Amino acid sequence: MKIEHVPGKNAGKIMLYALSTCGHCRNTKNLLNNLGVEYDYLFVDLVQGQEKEQVIALVEKWNPDLSFPTMVINDSKCIVGFREDDIKRALKL
């Protein structure tokens, strides 16, 4: 599985599970880029085979509805959807 890393300032451990064709996912990535924070992301729809099952199980742990984007912050907080204010608040920005 190909987890991509985006360098930036440390605002905690940020993992973004997204779909490559999702507009809300693109908006969330753009927000993180504009905020200049470091984060990792994975396009779940591009993962194949058994790895895809593992990723889906991981996302469902945080978001049983399996909707995107799903952002996990510091392995403790989950934000689902493009929620600009919630993201800024969670990252203390």
Descriptions of predicted regions:
Residues 26-30, 53-54, 82:
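Generic recognition of short, well-ordered alpha-helical segments
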Residues 73-93:
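Non-catalytic, surface beta->alpha helical segment in thiol-disulfide oxidoreductase systems
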Residues 36-38, 64, 75-76, 93:
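Short glycine/proline-enriched coil/turn segments at helix->beta-strand junctions
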Residues 22-25, 49, 80-81:
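Loop/helix-junction capping segments adjacent to catalytic residues or to phosphate/diphosphate-binding pockets
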Residues 1-4, 56-58:
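A generic local structural motif
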